[in-house]
Amino acid sequence: MKIINILFCLLLIVLNSCNANDNDTFNNNSVQQTKSRKKRDLSQKELLQQEKITLTSDEEKMFTSLVTAFKYTVEKLSGDTNGCNNENKNKCTGFFDWLSEDIQKQKELAGAFTKVYNFLKSKAQNEAFDTYIKGAIDCKKTLHKIVIIITNMEKVRTKRAYFRGVAGSIFTDNNDNDGIYKCLKDELLNDTSNHYEGLTSDWDN
């Protein structure tokens, strides 16, 4: 009888031990599932946030015009003695390819470009904006007002458009996309710069 009692006690100990292991396994699985669920929820939240960022029609229009203006400028100035060479052309292409994946940065640049865009659009009158700007870059229009550039602290009037001066600054002095982005945004927002003053001064209307 004593032997039976001993065996029964041993059986209870074994069962309790197994149950404890099962509980540990269950708890570990629960923790892992909770972590996985949180990670999945976070990823979905980030994805939803990215999906919410879109350009308005006006932002898209301004950003497209900005890209067109600078690509056209650098294309025209390839090989020029002012530093807008093939290296800058490659930087420009690479930069806007990089920017095409980041809607938030596109929104920020469109916003920064608003003041310049609206000013030039008011001068374009009935002419399409991109056509008007390309004409200025080609120096075929009467946009010689967009030509004041500061050299050795003196104002010099040349047949250089606003976009040429800015393009020279951002692509010549920066070697990475983040640097180009920051410089471009700062230039567009700076309404006290030589480029902006040259753009907006001495208009007849």
Curated annotation (Swiss-Prot):
A lipid is attached at C18 (N-palmitoyl cysteine). Pfam families: Mlp (PF03304). A lipid is attached at C18 (S-diacylglycerol cysteine). It is found in: Cell outer membrane. Keywords: Cell outer membrane, Lipoprotein, Membrane, Palmitate, Plasmid, Signal. One of its GO terms (cellular component) is cell outer membrane. Residues 1-17 form the signal peptide. An outer membrane protein that may participate in pathogenesis. Some human Lyme disease patients have antibodies against this protein. The Mlp proteins probably undergo intragenic recombination, generating new alleles. This plasmid is not found in the completely sequenced reference strain B31. This is Lipoprotein MlpB. It comes from Borreliella burgdorferi (strain ATCC 35210 / DSM 4680 / CIP 102532 / B31).
